[in-house]
């Protein structure tokens, strides 16, 4: 099968899904362009700030994309290209499109508050607190992981003498200096667009040219060689400042400009796949159990592994936090919700399909373990395709661009996750209907709701975990993230039912994702029990992971029972009305 044909057919199906299913959802939910959004009604110049649709699309897309739609499809390719293709297309249109769009819509109709507040209004305060605790701890893990990824991407390599190995450190130093200069560029862009009213089109053109100049400068001049620990501290300081800075200064302009790197990467990828039109030299289906195991560790059974491994690109709970966190507070008009939330997610699905084509192109090297790191697989496959289109000289240049783009998005996801965690932490202490600025928020609650205090607590926890043992509990993240997706679907379904609107499009995806995550957690608990019985060094981590997995199962069951009652009650009221 030709990879270009698969990619083109996939794009057409996703586009049809956006037009017909996305349009149907807008009608079912009652999207109202004349309704004032929280970005205008509650504008404070800090978190609530209306953004033009292209700018907000840049923020939303940069925040949800990251490395997820690259890593997941490549790792899940061990089951064959057909299961990956089907899950990306079906999951994109009927699962994550509904999930992301619904979370944003529900948040906008609840004053831009997070999905936790939606849980409170539709299920109850106890459910809200449980949901926020779970979401906050998941975000702390995300902060730890992405800070560590960024620090590893930037760090220098040292010789035994203690001196910097410049040859081995040059690529990381290049990425570091480009990323830092990118932040400076974003601040200037935000200042001129928002404070000097510079035309967005002209500013964008200048910004894109400046990005190219920064990349050239970074390749030629990279004087920063710092250790992993130093970069972790710098990341901590950066997200501490970035997460309490008004969104127009850094978050909006940086994510908007960052999105052009991703667009450029995707455009080159499409040119590479269509231009080289390679055959898919990998099995269509390998079986219901991972027997390829290129990393030496099998993913296990296709159910639930496929649906947990491919998160971004099919459905990811993190997206509901972004949509109901930062994006909802910047939405200029309700009519922008479909292209940003539903459309942005389907673009991410295209990136997932491109990732599948990349791993298929170098399948023999991947399955033998010669090239296994997803980012390297992605960059290698696509750069070699582009080499066939533009000549051998394009391979190294495009490889560097691919790796750099992924690194930039890890940084954008990092400070977005920190800001989201701050929102969650603040909302946890609020009573029903309260806002952080209300005079009723006093004493310890006022201190804990202070943005600087809540951000500092989040950053300290995240960076400390990143510098110690986050990798030991990271295996739980996949199931936790997909459980968050299932609970997000549950929350919006309950809220729509309470509002008297059609919520049936949420029921099957919700049930399916909760079954997937519970099955995955049961397998995880079983593996930890086996590890505990075997004993040996590191047995304490088997206990920790096992306990956390059991707690996640209990949390899921509790919230499902509470949410199920709310949905059933609302359905009964609707029938009686």
Task: Identify the residue ranges that each predicted region occupies.
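Extracellular/periplasmic helix-exit of transmembrane alpha-helices
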Residues: 273-291, 346-381, 416
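Juxtamembrane transmembrane-helix boundary signature
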Residues: 15-38, 60, 90-116, 194, ...
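Membrane-helix boundary/coupling elements in multi-pass transport proteins
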Residues: 67-74, 91-99, 103, 107-111, ...
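Loop-to-transmembrane helix boundary motifs in multi-pass membrane proteins
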Residues: 125-140, 343-350, 393-398, 427-467
């Amino acid at each position: 099968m030709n990879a270009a044909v698969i990619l083109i057919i996939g794009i057409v199906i996703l586009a049809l899904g956006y037009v017909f299913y996305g349009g149907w959802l807008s009608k079912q939910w009652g999207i109202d362009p004349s309704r004032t959004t929280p970005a205008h009604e509650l504008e404070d110049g800090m978190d609530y700030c209306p953004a033009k649709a292209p700018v907000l699309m840049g923020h939303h897309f940069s925040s949800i994309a990251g490395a997820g739609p690259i890593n997941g499809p490549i790792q899940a390719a061990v089951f064959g290209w057909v299961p990956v293709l089907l899950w990306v297309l079906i999951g994109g249109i009927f699962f994550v499109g509904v999930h992301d769009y619904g979370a944003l819509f529900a948040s906008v109709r609840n004053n831009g508050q997070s999905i936790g507040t939606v849980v409170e209004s539709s299920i109850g305060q106890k459910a809200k607190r449980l949901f926020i605790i779970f979401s906050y701890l998941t975000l702390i893990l995300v902060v730890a992981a992405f800070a560590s990824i960024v620090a590893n991407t930037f760090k220098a390599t040292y010789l035994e003498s203690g001196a910097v190995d410049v040859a081995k450190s040059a690529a990381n130093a290049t990425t570091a200096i480009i990323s830092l200069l990118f932040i400076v560029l974003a601040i200037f862009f935000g200042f001129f667009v928002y404070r000097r009213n510079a035309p967005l089109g002209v500013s964008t053109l200048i910004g894109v040219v400046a990005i190219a100049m920064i990349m050239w400068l970074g390749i030629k001049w990279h004087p920063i060689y710092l250790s992993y620990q130093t970069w972790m501290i710098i990341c901590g300081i950066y997200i501490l400042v970035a997460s309490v800075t008004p969104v127009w200064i850094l978050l909006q302009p940086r994510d908007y400009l960052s999105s052009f790197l991703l667009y450029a990467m995707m455009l080159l990828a499409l040119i590479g796949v269509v231009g080289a039109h390679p055959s898919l030299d990998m099995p269509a289906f390998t079986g219901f159990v991972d027997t390829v195991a290129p990393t030496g560790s099998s993913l296990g059974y296709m159910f639930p592994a496929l649906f947990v491994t491919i998160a971004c690109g099919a459905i990811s709970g993190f997206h509901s936090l972004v949509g109901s966190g930062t994006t909802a507070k910047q939405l200029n008009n309700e009519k922008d919700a479909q292209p940003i939330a539903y459309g942005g997610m389907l673009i991410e699905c295209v990136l997932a399909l491109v990732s599948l084509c990349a791993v298929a192109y170098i399948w023999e090297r991947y399955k033998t373990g010669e090239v296994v790191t997803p980012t390297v697989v992605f960059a290698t496959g696509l750069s070699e395709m582009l080499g066939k289109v533009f000549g051998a000289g394009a391979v190294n240049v495009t490889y560097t661009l691919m790796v750099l783009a992924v690194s930039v998005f890890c940084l954008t996801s990092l400070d977005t996750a920190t800001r989201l965690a701050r929102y969650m932490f603040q909302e946890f202490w609020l009573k029903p209907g309260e806002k952080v600025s209300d005079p009723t928020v006093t004493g310890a609650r006022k201190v804990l709701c202070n943005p600087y205090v809540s951000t500092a607590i989040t950053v300290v926890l995240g960076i400390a975990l990143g510098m110690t043992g986050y990798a030991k509990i990271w295996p739980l993240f996949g199931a936790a993230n997909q459980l968050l997706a299932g609970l997000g679907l549950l929350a919006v379904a309950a809220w729509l039912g309470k509002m008297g609107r059609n919520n049936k499009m949420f029921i099957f995806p919700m049930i399916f994702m909760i079954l997937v995550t519970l099955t995955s957690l049961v397998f995880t608990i079983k593996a930890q029990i086996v590890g505990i019985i075997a004993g040996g060094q590191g047995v304490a981590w088997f206990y920790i992971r096992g306990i956390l997995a059991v707690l996640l199962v209990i949390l899921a069951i509790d919230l499902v029972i509470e949410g199920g009652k709310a949905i059933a009650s609302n359905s009964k009221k609707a029938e009686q009305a």
